[in-house]
Amino acid sequence: MLPVIIAGAGPVGLALALALSRHGVPSVVLDGSDEGVVRRAARTCVLPPDVAHWARLPGLVEETTTWTGWRTTVRGKVVEEAVFTEERSPIHLPQHALEEALWRAVGRTGLVELLSPARLVDLEQHESGVTAHLKETPAGDSPSRRGSHLVGCDGARSTVRKLLGVAFPGRTAVERYAVAALRGGVPDTGEAALHRALPAPRRTGGARAEPPEVLVRPLAGGTVRLDWPLPPEENPVTPDALLERVERTLVGLNDGELPPHELLDTGVYACHQRLARWWRSGRVLLAGDAAHLVGALGTQQVAEGLRDVDNLAWKLAADRRPGGAEGLLESYAEERRGAVGARLRAVDQALPVIRGRGGRGGRLTGRGRLTLPADAHLGRGALGEPGRYAIPGQRDRTAEGGPLLGNPVTDVAVTALDGERGRLVDRLGGPLLLVLTAPGARVWDARHWLSAGLMPDLAGAVAALPLPAELLVTDAYPGAPAHTLLVVRPDGRLAAALPGADRRALERCVGDLTDLPVG
């Protein structure tokens, strides 16, 4: 069995290798970096609920933190507050911790071969797969590798993208930030916060310092990350200027006093807006930084890359089955490029509103301008929602008020046919999930309902589907009446809500969804 070749051993490349292994698909990861995992306390990532499962890797829990809530303040006055439940809170963690956990996880699969150093220099496509030509391969290794597909997860300067001749249009440095990670010094409320026009101390001589804007995001272990947007015309930030910014911010957050603190890391980074013109050429695809760059106004590049992984892995697995699934691979490019493109447009529209840099931003007033900067952090609106995919062959809703298709599934308690109980989101990333709403299912002994009502026929229908699927039962699902069969894609998107007794509707749905013959 030919493996999938993955160019790039960053978080997206490693996550894709791990996701493919869960479908039984082998992969070869080409690590062209000489650095290994770079440990930077100020380089972190925020994972929204739809990709939070990546923070549950073994050994990673102690490196993560969830926030109890959110506050937006302007000149010290709270203009917006939100409370997070543990299930709906974003997860914040150092990026190096995520990468190290992924390295450990792929090493345990037995299905992932890591080549390091291994630099891709050329690729060839043929009818049965792809050949990758390599440079600087490990001693004794072949200078070329064959695979069923090749996925470029090799960063913003992607070799794969360049070999395909794919344009990467967009804008450079739409925002610049200074950033610091420190231990102590910030009141430990458990909340993340955006402070705009933070009250600042007076300079020597009585003049008040320019009030800064700062984003405060707690990390595990009593550490915190601070981000300050920089004016586009500002000169390079010196270490002394950054230290002054840290101290001025801490004084503003602590009623005029500078508390004890330990500065762990500092830096300056730029946010770019770019989108590859196309993401697929035959058996070669792009994902992560190779396909898109986001990050302004709190949008999360790592999270978008992990959404690429969740969307692509099961489709690659399906395309390797007899007959292939050409339509599924094309849907990856359509769905993910469309979602990221919408995010980039939202940032372009919001930047002048929030920063007041020309256009209508300087004239816009009211509460919307005060709360818009929090949208990406709260998973709200075009800046923050995970995006919705159009589902082939399905209407938007099964009925008025029914569950909205194409969105991330709502997590509910489920029971498997073997009686095992758990949460729906914990079963994502593997087979297609078929969830029957059956009031009282958690109360009854599974031995009684497994052979009753719709279950025997449904179990037979599931066994006849052209790709692996698992039948689950839940008491209820928001918006779905009793005896509704919910079709949940491996990436956690709700694909259909069907009458539980309609086997033909299920077969049509799966055929439309997978591009594979059914029945």
Predicted segments, located by residue:
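N-terminal Rossmann-fold NAD(P) dinucleotide-binding loop
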Residues: 13-14
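FAD/FMN-dependent oxidoreductases across multiple families
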Residues: 237-304, 339, 343-346
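Active-site-adjacent segment of FAD-dependent monooxygenases/related oxidoreductases
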Residues: 39-107
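Conserved FAD-binding catalytic core of PHBH/FMO-like flavoproteins
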Residues: 149, 153-271
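A conserved short coil-to-beta-strand element within the FAD-binding core of flavoproteins
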Residues: 116-130
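Core beta-strand elements of the Rossmann-like FAD/NAD(P) dinucleotide-binding domain
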Residues: 139-149
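Glycine-rich FAD pyrophosphate-binding loop
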Residues: 21-42
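Helical substrate-recognition/capping region of FAD-dependent monooxygenase/halogenase enzymes
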Residues: 2-3, 7, 18-23, 32, ...
